[in-house]
């Protein structure tokens, strides 16, 4: 583990020496957390949250966003669960219960055909409602109702709307009447594995796992209205083009409302769950990825699917997003490894702590020009 962390530190230092300097700021200015989806691998977020809590970062967070397993963590953090409480929750969950079939092949097959998933997903939905109820006394609370109480963090959950082909953000501002438990259920609806969710938000659309289209929503808070301090905005060439188009459209429509510009929000801190090789390859432009031996239809199909998934995960990212991302080694554990042992759970927690510590060490090093 220590060699892996040292390798990440080395790559961070090398990358940052070639990047532009940024204006210095207080030790931490993070206000938003974003959690990537990763199924069972999300246990690693426990270690990351413990480290954020120790550093005093967690208490300053105002907004949280997440996809799939990251959505579950985002809800818990948003409701005010402590790092220890979240650790206890994720440690005690029997992930095999997520596979809530009907104990009958015919019923499962019927659901697969009609609802597009083998498992019901009811166990997860009920579980989330129970955690929500413990903090709010209402397991069926909507985003608006939660926001109106003004004592919780703002929660943003990612889903995929198959009816439109676009990502769907669930939040108090965008979907005020949607129940948080329902949005969490949508966000973790692995296609074909869990039944899709239909008829949400007053329509007949079909929703599935947010990870299908945006598994790592690091840019969800990249708008001017999400900034607490304008000093933490960075103007980028890629957003400049988008903003110019928005302004031109506003002029043509003679809109009197001010354009809510896109900005690179340095107040956002994200967490990703990747294999060691993936992390190194993304951080180090000179790294050479390993090659896959393709000699059969099976290996060809596997390589094709893997390539498409990797493309989807990274296509929306830019070269400067690594500066606000904590990459956590998922240790080769799969998203649906529901039989995960306590030993592997502990290893994930330690990986979360170690890689978060590595990032913060880099971030706080005065000799380096971090995302400040």
Predicted regions mapped to residue ranges:
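Patatin-like phospholipase
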Residues: 1-65, 75-372
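Gly/Ala-rich beta-loop-alpha elbow adjacent to hydrolase catalytic centers
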Residues: 66, 70
